[in-house]
A protein has these predicted regions:
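Rossmann-like NAD(P)(H) cofactor-binding subdomain of soluble oxidoreductases
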Residues: 101-156
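Internal alpha-helical scaffold of NAD(P)-dependent oxidoreductase catalytic cores
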Residues: 162-248
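Interdomain hinge/lid region at the active-site interface
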Residues: 229-303, 322
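Helix N-cap at the beta1-alpha1 junction of Rossmann-like dinucleotide-binding domains, i.e.
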Residues: 53-54, 122, 175
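Rossmann-like NAD(P)-binding element
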Residues: 72-115
Length: 389
């Protein structure tokens, strides 16, 4: 049997079960959340590294990992991570991955097979291209993308449960070693994510439609509000708030995402532009023959698209019955409503909250199975709740 020193780098065995150490490069929202999640899952050997000493220190303070800069020069030189997670911006993720692949390359004399390197950037074509162009050992690189986030950024916004029940896309490529893919997959599963596999082109086309274009549309609509009179904004309901919610996202990050995934985004926007031009042309002459039919068709096409989005637990969309319960804006009132619904044996399929403009009351829109709708309305009303069907 060959000794580790006699084996080539590609022959050194790699463990597809996470044991650590793990190095997280980039201690923002995603990086720090991964650190918190791994440590909560029992992997204590986690280190965080960031170009910002403050961000790195905060990540350590919240428990996301040990600050890499606290290691001595000798310890850093000998450092041999099993996994490196690159949580860098999209425009630099590939270059950082390439550096990590070279820095933590195999050391056959020590039996070290080298680090598996993954990134969590929201685009995947460019990082892979950058790694391949660098000449680094791409067999240990696995692109991945956890589809989770918040409007807030930075390590202070990190949550260990951020990835629970959220999709995590893993992008294999032709030269990657299967055991490296298995390791990254096991990490995603350990963090509670639901793993999906796509190639890098499929990934970028998909996220252009389901994430990047929605961000663009939300920002474009929200920009119309800049000169809107305050009296008009005070009347805004949940429809506008839902549509512009993600417009509060970090502009610096999204500039990088748009630039890195420009072509798939543009291809989707061409279709949106065609439909928008069609709508404008119809509304410019709304009494013309066929105008109302065209408007109805546009709306129906939207209905058809929405109906294809999976429902609860990934199943086919279900038609739920809805009711609205008026809830006083006082401590404990909403909790009492939910507790009483539970006491009545009803299962909530969905819950949406909306605040009433100018009144200390909220509206809880409750979705339930149609078979219990009438009984729940009756029972809640009997308990003194103000229910609107």
């Amino acid at each position: 049997m060959s000794s580790p020193a006699e084996l080539s780098a590609s022959e050194l065995p790699m463990d597809s079960t996470l044991t650590g150490p793990v190095l997280i490069i980039g201690s923002g929202l995603l990086g720090a959340s991964i650190g918190l999640g791994l440590r909560a899952a029992g992997c204590e050997d986690v280190y965080v590294q960031d170009i910002s000493p403050t961000a790195e220190a905060v990540a350590q303070d919240i428990g996301a990992g040990t600050s890499f800069s606290t290691l001595s020069e000798q310890e850093r030189t000998a450092f041999a991570p099993q996994l490196v997670v690159v949580a860098a911006p999209p425009d630099s993720a590939g270059a950082v991955c390439a550096r990590a692949l070279n820095t933590y390359a195999p050391r056959p004399e020590a039996g070290y097979p080298g680090a598996v390197v993954t990134d969590v950037a929201s685009v995947k074509v460019q990082p892979l291209a950058d790694v391949l162009a660098s000449g680094a050992d791409a067999s240990r690189y696995v692109g991945s993308h956890p589809m989770a986030g918040r409007e807030k950024s930075g390590p202070v916004a990190a949550r260990g449960e951020l990835f629970q029940a959220r999709p995590w896309i893993i992008c294999e490529h032709d030269s990657v070693r299967p055991e490296c893919v298995r390791l990254v997959r096991s990490v995603a599963v350990e963090l509670g994510a639901i793993v999906t596999s796509l190639n890098v082109e499929e990934h970028d086309q998909t996220v252009a439609l389901i994430s990047h274009v929605p961000q663009a549309m939300s920002s474009l609509l929200a920009s119309r509000l800049q000169d809107t009179p305050l009296y008009a904004l005070s009347l805004a309901g949940q429809g506008l708030r839902d549509t512009v919610r993600i417009a509060a996202s970090d502009p610096t990050l999204w500039v990088q995402i748009f630039a890195a995934n420009a072509d798939p985004i543009v291809q989707t926007l061409y279709g949106v532009r065609d439909d928008l031009n069609r709508l404008i042309a119809t509304l410019e002459n709304p009494t013309a023959s066929g105008a109302r039919l065209d408007l109805a068709q546009l709306m129906s096409e939207g209905n058809a698209g929405v109906s294809r989005i999976p429902g609860k637990h990934g199943t086919a969309p279900a038609a739920f019955a809805k009711m609205t319960v008026l809830v006083d804006d006082t401590p404990g009132t909403l909790a009492r409503l939910l507790a009483e619904i539970g006491e009545l044996g009803a299962n909530l399929e969905d819950l949406r909250l909306e605040h009433s403009t100018g009144a200390p009351v909220g509206m809880a829109e409750i979705s339930v199975n149609p078979s219990i709708h009438e009984a729940l309305v009756r029972d809640l009303s009997a308990r003194g709740w103000r229910v609107v069907k």
